[in-house]
UniProtKB/Swiss-Prot annotation:
Residues 1-10, 216-287, 329-348 are lumenal. A motif (D3) lies at residue 236. This is Ceramide glucosyltransferase-A. It comes from the Eukaryota. It comes from Xenopus laevis (African clawed frog).
Amino acid sequence: MAVLDLALQGLAIFGCVLFFVLWFMHFLSIVYTRLHLNKKISDKQPYSKLPGVSLLKPLKGVDPNLINNLETFFELDYPKFEILLCVQDLDDPAVDVCKKLLGKYPSDDAKLFIGGKKVGINPKINNLMPGYEVAKYDLIWICDSGIKVKPDTLTDMANQMTEKVGLVHGLPYVADRQGFAATLEQVYFGTSHPRSYISANVTGFKCVTGMSCLMRKEVLDQAGGLIAFAQYIAEDYFMAKAIADRGWKFSMATQVAMQNSGCYSISQFQSRMIRWAKLRINMLPATIICEPISECFVASLIIGWAAHHIFRWDIMVFFMCHCLAWFIFDYIQLRGVQGGPLNFSKLDYAVAWFIRESMTIYIFLSALWDPTISWRTGRFRLRCGGTAEEILDV
């Protein structure tokens, strides 16, 4: 009995620690968002002396927003950059979109590469290799096809690339679009994701997504170039790790990495979340424990039980109050990331928030159940440590 009492006491203390950790993350991410995001920073160097940038753009397929997203890069206000458009297949409809933009902006330093180069299992790396090999500037900007930018986005990122910084990344967010699936995505990328993403980066953990990353080419080459990361599916994590291991710091851009895909649905969002969870579990096995207990409903149950065990408070009353506080702070976080009025009502937010939180356990269990993922051009079986093998159809 004494052992059981000791174990319960330990679990209760764990619940209290969890409470303070999670609410520290809430406050930290909200404060950082308010102080840093969507703020115009002072120029660190004269406009004319900004370093040259080679933009690598991996493309596969088209969606209704692709041409508009790509065009924002041709309209960047930056003194010296090149656009390297990379398409894997000759018959990909993205080729025609690229040719149309190249014809519309003949004075821009832009090139189209078709065919890729097979150097590993990662299809994104394979696609980017021809562009990377001819990139002529010291800074490499890898930016996904679904991202749109403002004219001064690259200037903002380049100003963050100070002497000791080796990588500048943008916090992923989602543009205003119509429909509930768009609201669901916006709620996730404005609440749960930035809470973890910002807290990790501010406290020294290297958390980077590859949607929009500006990196020093020299440092990547020291790590073996893009080819060194072709064995991984989550190449962005391992590129960031290689840069950090060489003593370089990271900086977050003041502008978000604005996702603006023209194709979206609840099922696509769910599949994407499951794929990301699978990658995190295989790269960082501690995710198996940390991820579920960092979500609202599970955390509220654990903390509510701890409050009942220590203070004899009613579990369900505490659970409801804790969830309500979480819900309110998430809304504050979302408004901060948005940087302006939301495109949906508070009722839409409440419904999307509840559905997103309710999906978390299903997403996590689905990720544990099956270690294979479908991504871009194939299916892959993940291995512990982040490597993968392609599953070939027989």
